[in-house]
């Protein structure tokens, strides 16, 4: 104990001999490095959690938690009780194991309903179970789509009749809960409708209605009239957005970013025009048909006095009166005036009117008339057509921009921990060298002549070695003494 006090007093003298700056560095740097190393070690030892399942019903959540407890896996549950988190390194393996056990079922029962059916069931119970099984299997299939988070299918099966004329058609409705930011295309809606109709007997696609969680009838997208209206609305929005971007870019380059806000409303004419023209050119004629006819008639003239003598033919060798020859020519030519027919269909979208609304920050001083002329020229507006420009100057609300903290990679913490350990080692090495600088030992008394030094004197330990040995044997007392010195300053 006396040796411990002796060395502790020596250590205290060494510490008191240091300057205040050296004292602060000797105590603060090791503590700081130890703190950094501890923080880095704690962070690296923490497990990263990831989502195992989300959107779970209470029954499914209970089933998943039960299986996780059996596996001895740590988990966390979100405040709303619909999402469960597990360590990232075991998430994939757990999904495979739970899927093999049929967990979670999302509250939907399919053909596995018949696994628990009783021995004796009435015909009505069999029909109900069959309908529930089909509904469940269809819902599972629909939920395999990327955009569908939850699906529910309702089928109405009519009772079979002995008369074909009285037989009714089956009907079905599908409810979909879409994932945030997802929208089904008309092709996907049509595929869902065909899937349901193809899975149920006597169910036509036209008898299937698809509704989403926002109350919209998605089957309306398949109507031709709706497609036309939706297409026209899309063209209108694209036209308006194009003008907005053009004006917004031009004005922000002049007044600065965030100083103006542009809104454009356009009225477009989607009507098409069909035109048919017939042009006649009287100077250009063409022969359509031509017909020519020629007739020639030869007859003998009558001679002498009418009566018997006139009817008696002349004697042989006697030259009688002359012959009568008649010719007739007829020519018919049909002409037609040149005609040209033109068929023309104009499907060009026409702009009927454009209205531009501009909101500008009140801090910006502008000439309203010049700004209006700039907008008219930039957007190609025509006041004669009825185009309008409205400018309003109001103070803008300055949003509070919260800078997103960048995620520090793991290797940065590892590097900090290694550097901290290196610096801690260097500081410890410096302190050891500083403490080993003890004052010169007193001159020992001369040894008795002729008497050699003992082995204990030759192998006598240095004060630093003895101090380390005492600290190992009684660390608690050494710590108490160091704390006392720190308090004394």
UniProtKB/Swiss-Prot annotation:
Membrane topology: Multi-pass membrane protein
Matching Pfam families: YscJ_FliF, YscJ_FliF_C
Biological process annotations from GO: bacterial-type flagellum-dependent cell motility
Subcellular location, principal: membrane
Keyword annotations: Bacterial flagellum, Cell inner membrane, Cell membrane, Membrane, Transmembrane, Transmembrane helix
Protein family: Belongs to the FliF family.
Quaternary context: The basal body constitutes a major portion of the flagellar organelle and consists of five rings (E,L,P,S, and M) mounted on a central rod. The M ring is integral to the inner membrane of the cell and may be connected to the flagellar rod via the S ring. The S (supramembrane ring) lies just distal to the M ring. The L and P rings lie in the outer membrane and the periplasmic space, respectively.
Protein name stated in the entry: Flagellar M-ring protein
Record organism: Aquifex aeolicus (strain VF5)
Gene name of the record: fliF
